[in-house]
């Protein structure tokens, strides 16, 4: 299997589930003309996948994209500390959505799975000291929404409604269920 992603979290989730894969990243510009946020994220994941799949028609290719959305606005990876502070301040005390889209394809076997998983996360009310402490960990700067639920960022989270691993970057349970539906046995996932 080829993972079309540099995300350390996705790699960790897939390795922990027993998948063997190689990483080949695409160099597409992560933009989409789709108006609906979930369609836009799925479109970006598909573009990442297609760039790799067209040159690897006999391989399974997996691509994904994750965003944090608050009140219709996407919070990507912060450009600097000030933007990260603003993101976290805006998330403070509120419920936001984490949207992960993934596409799994094998051209020669005519296999295609397209999926979007939406989870909700509620943050505690965060004071400036807590936000600055978290920023000092350097954890938020390579993550959508400026936090990682699997690290120090977990202390910011009051509750979640949805898939923890999707919030982390890849909905492994959903993916495994989709593989079962198309006839792949979980005991053979290291062969995919």
Curated annotation (Swiss-Prot):
Domain of life: Bacteria
Site (Important for substrate specificity): 9, 66, 150
Compartments it resides in: Cytoplasm
CC annotations in GO: cytoplasm
Active site: 65
Named cofactor requirement(s): a divalent metal cation
Keywords: Cytoplasm, Hydrolase, Nucleotide metabolism
GO biological process: nucleotide metabolic process
Protein EC: 3.6.1.9
GO molecular function annotations of the record: dTTP diphosphatase activity; nucleoside triphosphate diphosphatase activity; UTP diphosphatase activity
Keyword Cytoplasm belongs to the record: yes
Primary localisation category: cytoplasm
Catalytic activity field: dTTP + H2O = dTMP + diphosphate + H(+); UTP + H2O = UMP + diphosphate + H(+)
Task of the protein: Nucleoside triphosphate pyrophosphatase that hydrolyzes dTTP and UTP. May have a dual role in cell division arrest and in preventing the incorporation of modified nucleotides into cellular nucleic acids.
Family membership noted in the UniProt record: Belongs to the Maf family. YhdE subfamily.
Name of the protein in its database record: dTTP/UTP pyrophosphatase
Organism: Fusobacterium nucleatum subsp. nucleatum (strain ATCC 25586 / DSM 15643 / BCRC 10681 / CIP 101130 / JCM 8532 / KCTC 2640 / LMG 13131 / VPI 4355)
Organism taxonomic ancestry: Bacteria, Fusobacteriati, Fusobacteriota, Fusobacteriia, Fusobacteriales
């Amino acid at each position: 299997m080829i993972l079309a992603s540099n995300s350390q979290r996705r790699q960790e989730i897939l390795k922990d589930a027993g998948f063997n894969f190689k990483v080949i990243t695409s160099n597409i510009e992560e933009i989409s003309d789709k108006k609906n946020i979930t369609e836009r994220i799925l479109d970006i994941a598909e573009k990442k996948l297609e760039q790799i799949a067209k040159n690897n028609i006999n391989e399974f290719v997996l691509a994904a994209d994750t965003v944090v959305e608050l009140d219709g606005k996407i919070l990507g990876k912060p450009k600097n500390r000030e933007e990260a502070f603003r993101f976290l301040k805006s998330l403070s005390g509120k419920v936001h959505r984490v949207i992960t889209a993934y596409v799994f394809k094998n051209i020669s076997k005519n296999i295609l799975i397209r999926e979007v998983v939406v989870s909700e996360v509620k943050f505690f009310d965060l004071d400036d000291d807590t936000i600055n402490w978290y920023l000092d960990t350097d954890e938020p700067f390579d993550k959508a929404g400026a936090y990682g639920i699997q690290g120090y960022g977990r202390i910011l989270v009051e509750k979640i409604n949805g898939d923890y691993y999707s919030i982390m970057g890849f909905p492994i349970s959903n993916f495994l269920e989709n593989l079962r539906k198309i006839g792949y046995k979980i005991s053979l996932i290291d062969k995919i």
